[in-house]
């Protein structure tokens, strides 16, 4: 029986490349001359720390980072940015978290959405991914289109497509 897995993963190497590209752009931009502004990627906690001298500049840096992530194939919705910007001494910073895996509430929404579609497929939650199986390849492709079209707050990838 054909099946596939729905996952939400961020390639950390591509994220590192995007952070490096954003750092290079900040070094060459005129509005960031003589300003302490930086990006730091922490592989262990999967966070990106954005640091600058004012809250306005932190927001500009986040826009640059989102653009560079998008160029590297990582959607902006995979970056979880908290609302509050922390002020410490003379610097402002924010720690944006890269979303890895699908949360259980989102998993339940996806499974409910698949079951409500009345397609002849089964969806099973397996850890932080969802396995979808069905008899028809067309039904599985319809599920893929439905998950892509649904506004669930994070990007999804499909892997392990088997016949």
UniProtKB/Swiss-Prot annotation:
Gene: yajQ
Record keywords: ATP-binding, GTP-binding, Nucleotide-binding
Protein name: Nucleotide-binding protein YajQ
Keyword Signal: no
SUPFAM superfamilies hit by this protein: YajQ-like
UniProt source species: Escherichia coli (strain K12)
Quaternary data: Monomer.
UniProt cross-references to Pfam families, sorted A to Z: DUF520 (PF04461)
Entry GO terms, CC: cytosol
InterPro entries in UniProt: DUF520 (IPR007551), UPF0234-like_C (IPR035571), UPF0234_N (IPR035570), YajQ-like_sf (IPR036183)
PANTHER family (UniProt xref): UPF0234 PROTEIN YAJQ
Gene Ontology biological-process annotations: DNA damage response; response to hydrogen peroxide
Entry domain remark: Composed of two domains, each centered on a beta-sheet, connected by two helical segments.
């Amino acid at each position: 029986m054909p099946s596939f897995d729905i996952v939400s993963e961020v390639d950390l190497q591509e994220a590192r490349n995007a952070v490096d590209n954003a750092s290079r752009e900040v070094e060459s931009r005129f509005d960031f001359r003589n300003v302490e502004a930086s990006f730091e990627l922490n592989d262990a906690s999967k966070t990106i720390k954005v640091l600058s001298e004012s809250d306005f500049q932190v927001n500009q840096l986040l826009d640059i980072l989102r653009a560079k992530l998008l160029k590297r194939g990582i959607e902006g919705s995979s970056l979880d940015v908290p609302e509050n910007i922390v002020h410490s001494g003379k610097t402002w910073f924010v720690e944006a978290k890269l979303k890895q895996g699908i949360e259980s509430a989102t998993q339940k929404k996806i499974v409910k959405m698949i079951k409500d579609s009345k397609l002849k497929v089964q969806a099973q939650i397996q850890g932080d991914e969802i396995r979808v199986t069905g008899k028809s390849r067309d039904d599985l492709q319809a599920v893929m289109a439905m998950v892509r079209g649904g506004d669930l707050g994070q990007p999804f990838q499909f892997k392990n497509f088997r016949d």
